[in-house]
Amino acid sequence: MIRTMLQGKLHRVKVTQADLHYEGSCAIDQDFMDAAGILEYEAIDIYNVDNGQRFSTYAIAGERGSRIISVNGAAARCACVGDKLIICSYVQMSDEQARSHSPKVAYFSGENELQRQAKAIPVQVA
C-alpha cells in the first residue's frame, strides 16, 4: 500500500506579494523552503487561513532572507497581500515507511519570522 503523507509545512506565513501576470507558481524565501524541506518546482498545496481558499501550484525559490511569499499567476486570485497561508508538500511512501515518517514543520510569526521548527504537529486536545 502507498500512502500520501505530509512532508513539509510552512504554518501561517503572510503573503507579501500577489502577481496575477507572473508565470504561475508561489515564490518562497529559500530559507523557508529549507526549513520545510520544500524543493524548487515541487508541487505544493496552499490553504488560505483568511478566506478558506485551497489551491495547488508549485514552489519557486524567492530571494534568501527576503521573507517573500509571492502568490503568482491564476493563484493570485486566491490570496491577497497580508493573507495568512499554510503551505504544504506531500510525499508518497510505503505503509511501513509512513509509520515512522516525521514531517518538517516551520511555524511563523505575523511578519514571516521563523519562530520554531518541529518534526510533528501537536495532538489536538478535546
Curated annotation (Swiss-Prot):
The keyword Chloroplast does not apply. Binds 1 pyruvoyl group covalently per subunit. Substrate binds at residues 57, 73-75. Pfam families: Asp_decarbox. Disulfide bonds: none annotated. GO terms for molecular function: aspartate 1-decarboxylase activity. It is an enzyme of class 4 (lyase). Is synthesized initially as an inactive proenzyme, which is activated by self-cleavage at a specific serine bond to produce a beta-subunit with a hydroxyl group at its C-terminus and an alpha-subunit with a pyruvoyl group at its N-terminus. GO terms for cellular component: cytosol. CDD domains: Asp_decarbox. Its EC number is 4.1.1.11. The active site is at 25 (schiff-base intermediate with substrate), 58 (proton donor). Pathway: Cofactor biosynthesis; (R)-pantothenate biosynthesis; beta-alanine from L-aspartate: step 1/1. The keyword rRNA processing does not apply. It comes from the Bacteria. GO terms for biological process: alanine biosynthetic process; pantothenate biosynthetic process. It catalyses: L-aspartate + H(+) = beta-alanine + CO2. Keywords: Autocatalytic cleavage, Cytoplasm, Decarboxylase, Lyase, Pantothenate biosynthesis, Pyruvate, Schiff base, Zymogen. Belongs to the PanD family. Heterooctamer of four alpha and four beta subunits. Catalyzes the pyruvoyl-dependent decarboxylation of aspartate to produce beta-alanine. This is Aspartate 1-decarboxylase.
